[in-house]
Amino acid sequence: MQWEVVIGLETHAQLSTASKIFSGTSTAFGAEANTQASPVDLALPGVLPVLNKGAVERAIQFGLAIGATISPRSVFARKNYFYPDLPKGYQISQYEIPVVQGGTITIQVEGRKGEFYEKTVNLTRAHLEEDAGKSLHEDFAGMTGIDLNRAGTPLLEIVTEPDMRSAAEAVAYAKALHSLVVWLGICDGNMQEGSFRCDANVSVRPLGQKEFGTRREIKNLNSFRFLQQAIEYEVQWQIAEIEDGRKIQQATVLFDPETGETRAMRTKEDAHDYRYFPDPDLMPLEIDASWVERVRGELPELPVAMQARFVSQYGLSAYDATTLTATKAFAAYYEAVVADAGAANAKPAANWLMGDVASQLNREGIAIDAAPVTPAQLARLLARIADGTVSNNTAKKDVFPAMWAGEHGGDADAIIAAKGLKQMSDTGELEKIIDDVLAANARSVEEFRAGKEKAFNALVGQAMKATKGKANPAQVNELLKKKLG
């Protein structure tokens, strides 16, 4: 039997406000345990929550960026459950009327054969809520500690429709969402610190069946790799269970990175188990049209708009445009290179950024802002490739690594001169070298004339070797073809 995977994601993005959502306490990460927990965060008697306007503005920004509806009136509700790191015994969230409704995010997904396809993921909602504290299970022998510094940190919970059909689609969506919230500046996106974490709702059903299967929710996935591994394992587990004649039970599960497996944590609750009701301590949130329009006017150029511009203005593919706009800084670097190198170098600039530059950044674990090669320096190198001063191969193998290492101040011209890397420009000298190569490789000449194309490549290789790689490969090809008739 063929199976179809159905996936929906719930993502918690910590909003980048200086203070918590209902108190003035700092949200700075890394403070000593329980030093950033006010009476409001601790749920002490006689205190009332006060909504952080900055958190609301960030929610509006996100809603506008995904083309969603901003609710003119939304309501905060109490989500009732008991857990040691939840001091009040309830979490302030939004239930019936969230601040953001609907919206879409378009993603580029890599298929099984390496091709890319586009897909639009529909969002159900995004709502404001407070984060819980943190349980410290490994800090005390035989006991669990509680750190309430995180309690009350503003969260935007972003919920999709069950639109994704593979782990690859889920990861592509999570990466696109991560890129967007960081681009907007509403979340720092630090997954190691828990600023951006995903819950995946996964089910399977026979291919062609309309009804959804029973879902299991994988909680707190804080890396894209774990998200992919968890979904892939869970899918295979569910299929095996059904094929063995067992029923899937709705449950909340955890992913163990050590074993690569999911394991049930508890029976999955439904909304009625949380006994939602409007929080009597908070007035309904009212957002008028003028507030929304002011926020709209302050939005930066969004990734989707920039991607469309890169395709139309620079002739890039949709995949290239998406890759180059992964972060605002990466996109800005690219545009700075093209501004210096000219529009004719738009595609080569994209190739260099996605190739050699990205490889160096990944190897050293640094962001584009910290790259030792400036946009102007890379533009100069592209110009030298374009005018034939150096070949693309020499630029990659010899010039760029020296620029990255800071040799000669990262100046491409100085490095080319110092290393003697300039391509041969004397046609007469090159013709003489090719004549010598043909004379010394009579057998290859005969094989080529007998129809063996590989022999021609061998002659090109000998010519490049004789010039120590300084000849222009295109010119070598042209002269060889001319002389071989």
Curated annotation (Swiss-Prot):
GO biological process: glutaminyl-tRNAGln biosynthesis via transamidation; translation
SUPFAM superfamilies: GatB/YqeY motif (SSF89095), Glutamine synthetase/guanido kinase (SSF55931)
Record key words, sorted: ATP-binding, Ligase, Nucleotide-binding, Protein biosynthesis
Catalytic activity: L-glutamyl-tRNA(Gln) + L-glutamine + ATP + H2O = L-glutaminyl-tRNA(Gln) + L-glutamate + ADP + phosphate + H(+); L-aspartyl-tRNA(Asn) + L-glutamine + ATP + H2O = L-asparaginyl-tRNA(Asn) + L-glutamate + ADP + phosphate + 2 H(+)
GO MF annotation list: asparaginyl-tRNA synthase (glutamine-hydrolyzing) activity; ATP binding; glutaminyl-tRNA synthase (glutamine-hydrolyzing) activity
E.C. no: 6.3.5.-
Any one Pfam family match given in the protein's UniProt record, by short name: GatB_N
Cysteines engaged in disulfide bonds, as pairs: none
InterPro entries noted in UniProt: Asn/Gln-tRNA_amidoTrfase_suB/E, Asn/Gln-tRNA_Trfase_suB/E_cat, Asn/Gln_amidotransferase, Asn/Gln_tRNA_amidoTrase-B-like, GatB, GatB_C_1, GatB_Yqey_C_2, Gln-tRNA_amidoTrfase_suB_CS
Keyword Transferase in record: no
Cross-referenced SMART domains: GatB_Yqey
Function, in words: Allows the formation of correctly charged Asn-tRNA(Asn) or Gln-tRNA(Gln) through the transamidation of misacylated Asp-tRNA(Asn) or Glu-tRNA(Gln) in organisms which lack either or both of asparaginyl-tRNA or glutaminyl-tRNA synthetases. The reaction takes place in the presence of glutamine and ATP through an activated phospho-Asp-tRNA(Asn) or phospho-Glu-tRNA(Gln).
Record's subunit section: Heterotrimer of A, B and C subunits.
Entries under HAMAP family matching the protein: GatB
Family named by the database record: Belongs to the GatB/GatE family. GatB subfamily.
PANTHER family: GLUTAMYL-TRNA GLN AMIDOTRANSFERASE SUBUNIT B MITOCHONDRIAL AND PROKARYOTIC PET112-RELATED, GLUTAMYL-TRNA(GLN) AMIDOTRANSFERASE SUBUNIT B, MITOCHONDRIAL
Name assigned to this protein: Aspartyl/glutamyl-tRNA(Asn/Gln) amidotransferase subunit B
Organism: Cupriavidus necator (strain ATCC 17699 / DSM 428 / KCTC 22496 / NCIMB 10442 / H16 / Stanier 337)
